[in-house]
Amino acid sequence: MKTHYFKKIFNLKFLVIFFSILFCILLILDLTFERRIKGIKKRTDEIIKKIKDDNHLVEEIVFYETNSTIFEKSFYRVEILVKNKNNLTTKEKWYAVVDSIFFHEIHSLIKGRENIQIKDPKTDFHLSELILSLVPIVSSTIFMFYIISNIKKSSGKLNSNAKVSAKQKSLFTFKDVAGNTEEKEEMTELIDFLKQPQKYETIGAAIPKGVLLEGPPGTGKTLLAKALAGEASVPFYAVSGSEFVEMYVGVGASRVRTLFKEAKLNAPCVLFIDEIDVLGGKRGGNSSGGNQEKDQTLNQLLTEMDGFTQAKGIIVIGATNRADMLDAALLRPGRFDRKILVNLPDIKSRAEILKLHAQNKKLSSDIDFHQLAQQTPGMSGAQLAAVLNEASILTVRNHKDFITMTELSEALDRVLMGPAKKSIKYDPEERRMVAYHEAGHAVIGIKLKHAQKVQKITIIPRGNAGGYNLMMPEKETFFSSRKRMLAQIQSFLGGRVAEELVFDDISSGAFDDFRQATKIARLMVTKYGMSDLGVSQDSEFSDKKLIDTAIKKIIDNCYARTKHLMLENKTLLDQIAHLLLEQETITQAEIEQLVVNTKK
């Protein structure tokens, strides 16, 4: 109780107030003393003058010795009692703080004058002097106590800064994880390891010590780890790799030890390390201080997972989107025994994710999650959740009671391209050029066999784009072919070709299209072996000129084929552009109707 009260007194707020008051007292006393010192010469001259003056009778002079802690010098406070010759009943008392020179001067001045009584110097006790002498001692003591206590606290925080929640259980289960069917099957087996470890130990089976979840951001790696802990009803520890990185040497390794020590006390448990590539990156030959600290932290993690002191009953789950950056010692069996690739969701999983995130939302009866899933290939679970959240916000903004496909479509555009910039007003000729540019992309998507198909076209500016085509593949594939990649290049070039054919001019709006087309062509040449250079991959010794020539050849051939296809479908190009100028946005159904009308 006393210790707690003592700590409560010496908190930061109290110390600030205490030192502020102490400083004010010290300042007042110091100023008072200085004011008295500044008046010494004036008062000394005045006193000497009045002692010499015949109009005054000096009766008594008393000296008090004062040892100043400020000036480290002896002073005297002199008190003089005098009478006025003209009025003997009137007495005056003068005083001053003087130095030893004045003390001797007074003695020589009044020497032999019997009517003046001089008393020997007395010690002058002043409370202010006592306070002034005690202030440095008391202040230093309190300050040192505060510094030491803070160092202890800081040391504790540095050693264990991880977000530990050992006393809490994860509230998530695999029911809260939509999609990721194969990943959940792999994780389900770990539940039995955590619940009944002795069943495996009796037959000599080693329980997996670590599971590495690798995949793009937003695919649900953290959620899978939480669901595992929730299903097994065991404590869940969650830390980030960056929490082990500090400027102080040895702190990272100390935090790893502290974390595993805490986890061992609550085993069986799940220890989740997000962005483990920060902590477990490859060790190099650089011996700088930062790398040494990083290597020490990694070495401690390796030791804790499978070293002299093995962590029993603890399943370590690491999550990263850069598994290629991890150290080989961390990936070997005995540490991360299992590696699970968490891919972006397919169309079925996307529909399930959308339904899961829509459970607490008011939806219109016309919502088609399968159609929405078709329009979102390549999107992660986090992005799909963002689409539904944006749709909810738009519904409130539009003063509606239910989320409709209109809000969902707009929310999808906002997540992919950003909010619409309807305040931007195009010049009529610019607007017409944008319409034909987007129509050019659409024509290639409609008429080219292996190209992605158009879902929606708009000339409403979003982000840095003057307009855009929402184009999706007819079916999802796990790899790309040469024909698909060439068709994709032609789709990017369609806008530029349309501008050239209609206006005999080109705009800077195709800048990003060229960048994307060139990127695909470069991959075909340098990585996939889909050019005349053969199947060899690019290296530092490759002839850059030959590579650039091969890339240019692919782009030129695609441009020529795109131009030929655009000339064959000039009527469809005009109809799409005119409808865009009228409506600004065209849906997939309207595009299909235009194609049917053009064929008649």
UniProtKB/Swiss-Prot annotation:
Its EC number is 3.4.24.-. Homohexamer. Zn(2+) binds at H437, H441, D513. This is ATP-dependent zinc metalloprotease FtsH 1. It holds the Pfam family AAA. GO terms for biological process: protein catabolic process; proteolysis. Acts as a processive, ATP-dependent zinc metallopeptidase for both cytoplasmic and membrane proteins. Plays a role in the quality control of integral membrane proteins. It is found in: Cell membrane. ATP binds at G215, P216, P217, G218, T219, G220, K221, T222. Keywords: ATP-binding, Cell membrane, Hydrolase, Membrane, Metal-binding, Metalloprotease, Nucleotide-binding, Protease, Transmembrane, Transmembrane helix, Zinc. CDD domains: RecA-like_FtsH. Gene3D superfamilies: 1.10.8.60, P-loop containing nucleotide triphosphate hydrolases, Peptidase M41.
